[in-house]
Amino acid sequence: MGQDHSVEARPPPTHEEVVRHLAGKFADKCYTPLEIYSLKDNFKSLADTVQDVKYLKEDTVARFLEIPDALRVTPVLFQSVSFLAAFPFLRDAPAVLGLEQLVIAITILTGRWKRVLKSPADRTKLLFKSLAVYDRKLSCATLTPVASPMAAEAKGASAGFAVDEAGDDDEAEDDGDDDLVLAAFESLDCVDAFRHGDAPPKIQGAMIPADNFVRLIMLLLLVAPLDPQERLSQYSDRLVGTELEDLHATAQCVVQAFLDVEEVPGLTWSRFRKILPVCCPFMFDAGFNALFSHFLFSKNIDFNKRKPTGSEEDRGEQPKLPQKATPSQSTLPQPLLPQAGSILNANILSQLSFFIPGDSLFRCLRLLYSGDEDGFSMGSFESKVFNWRAPTLLLVRGRRLDDHPDGTRESAFAASIPPRRFPNGGGGGTTENSDEIITFGAFIAQPWRHTHRECFGDDSSVLFQLGPVHDVFRASTMNRDYAGFVKPTGSGSSNHHGGIMFGCPAPSPSKASSATGALVALGSVSLFLDSSFEFGVFTHDHTSRGGAYAGSTSRPRNFQERFAVNCLEVWGCGGDEESKRQAERWAWEAREAEARRKINLGTGDLEADRALLEMAGLVGQNRSGGSMI
């Protein structure tokens, strides 16, 4: 006792040791041996070598992933990859893309880091930093690619993107320590390195340039339906002519949710983190996961190769290692949609997958109703949609109306709803731009039914706008007026103009007026289509509370859109089983209708026959025995 024992302090690990340890941990915990073998094989075949250092160049990564030149997104994507490859030492970004750095970047981009890093944080902040530049003069900002390991080494340990000194930027908030980076150091038992100077750079002053963000959204729309073993080149038909123009237009609608490209040069962190979880929570998930999983499938290994015989082994022939088979270049992918719609196409489908899980959309939709084909009537809508027992997706597109009604029918619609109080929602130009095409929709998980005193739907319902501004209105818990289908009634205590409504209260006999001029009650955040499917109105009363749908995160203001309906369609979400059930119900109803037509009362007395049918509830009381058109 009393004798001092000198304990030699262990020196802190170097950056290289930390990166090697983290990459090894990711490889062991996040991948199968087969996937790591394929990743190493792909890296070996793709890497360039400078002074015994193997690394991947920008054009090599783009060529392997088949990134289209038409999108001009390769520099943006490689900036993100090389930044994430520097994890957890983000101050050293951009990193040379060696094997260990590639493992780290792919682990983050595919979301597999969750198997190792136990942190409540997500990768949102990392993704923003990987796409942002720190130059206030964004018009002059350029991305500086890493040409080689020697060039990166010459730039010093603090090499990366140009960073200005902190100034009086609007983005003055201190984002604090990055939880994901801290979790990485904790998993390696070297938290002191994080606390003593290796913390990631601050977000203050960072922006994603608007042009870069548009190109990135175009890529994400393209890769959204991609399967890990599908070739991106299989979707090349979406990159020519009008298809490319439509892809760009769809991307512009999504970008409008984050920023007005005519007003601001780039996207800030505060705006990014505010909008992304509400309007585009799945934007980076499915597409990036599948795209960067391509590195985990090697083309040099054939899973279908037979095991060599003993004579082959005697001749020294090496067997091929088993691997998941990569798809043949001649294999045609299953179409994303079984048929084209008037509104829904591949780009709109990808846009929907940004906030509705893609598993419910891609190769799972069936066109139930189309106004162009089935007629714009509630009777036709009911006969086509009500038998679908799975979730449905309603889309409506129309032309924005002027403030002053034009014609008797438009005037009648304006007289059926409360007077306009709010300006237009804006989007594709000035807020007063009439004749602009606008698109709304709703996702309803419950089957459709008639609405008498209670609406249908649940808290998974979503109301949304797709153009000219992408916006999402999540279900609220304040009330349950999620969806309604009300046929018009011209008299009585339950008088209602009728129509399809989302976020509007159900008809209430105690409050309804018997006068034919009663107004439709519009919810604070609501979409209403009149009974003729000729006009519609979307209302966003930001000052009110208690609606069935939450207000806009992107546009916290009052606005209203009145429009003339051009297209209306409903898609059923589900597979062959749901289609089979619907077909069976249609067949049963057809048999019942045929049986009703063949009823032979045999009395010869028309008045007595009619009285008997009225007692059965088949005619009379505003019933005609068929659908009301």
From Swiss-Prot:
Residues 342-574 form the TLDc domain. Pfam families: TLD. Keywords: Cytoplasm. Residues 307-318 have a biased composition (Basic and acidic residues). Residues 307-336, 406-431 are annotated as: Disordered. GO terms for biological process: response to oxidative stress. It is found in: Cytoplasm. GO terms for cellular component: cytoplasm; nucleus. Residues 326-336 have a biased composition (Low complexity). Belongs to the RTC5 family. May be involved in a process influencing telomere capping. This is Restriction of telomere capping protein 5. It comes from Pyricularia oryzae (strain 70-15 / ATCC MYA-4617 / FGSC 8958) (Rice blast fungus). The gene is RTC5.
